[in-house]
Amino acid sequence: DYIKGTGTKLPKHTPISCNELLKAMLVHSDNYAAHALSRSAGMSRTQFIQKMNQKAKQLGMNSTRFHDSSGLSSANISSAMDLVKLAKYSMNKPQIQMLSNTKATYVRAGRQNVFMQNTNRLVREEMFDAAINKTGYIRESGYNLVFVNKHQCNKATIGVISLNNASSGARSNFTRHKLEQYGCDVLAHEDYGLEEDEES
């Protein structure tokens, strides 16, 4: 299917396993992979989105409403506190945790191995050790990032939710500044500046 406002590295009309789609989703923020994964669930689009909203309610995400499975609709809404609840839930899911923190990987698509890098520069360049993280972007909300540090900072678990940034570099720098401010150790000390992440 064509999804307006995004592209994909994945080849068309190619069999891809659900595990490989999840990998593309969580490492590279591939919206086509998210859409294809929902299509493979054995239910209609409407039923799948209903399941997403039911899960959000189950997690206490009372300000969250999903309108599509790819994450690109401006009708999808949430709140910072709901993202905290989702991050806590995701931290108890080893596969989600592992994939979201993978620097780069190959996604098996038919006979091809498609190289994909993490869309989060803090993970890709190993600035911090993440427990869970996820980037996001649409025009209406700007560049966003949820990042929870793996190791305690001054005896506390520190997470940063960076919303409505003008660029991917800005969200990375804001998050890095907050993690440093609360005593989280930087794993690399080069001056990374404002260079851009891959979009999403």
Across the structure, where does each feature detected by a protein language model lie?
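Conserved catalytic neighborhood of penicillin-recognizing serine enzymes
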Residues: 2-38, 114-132
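Penicillin-recognizing serine hydrolase domain
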Residues: 43-200
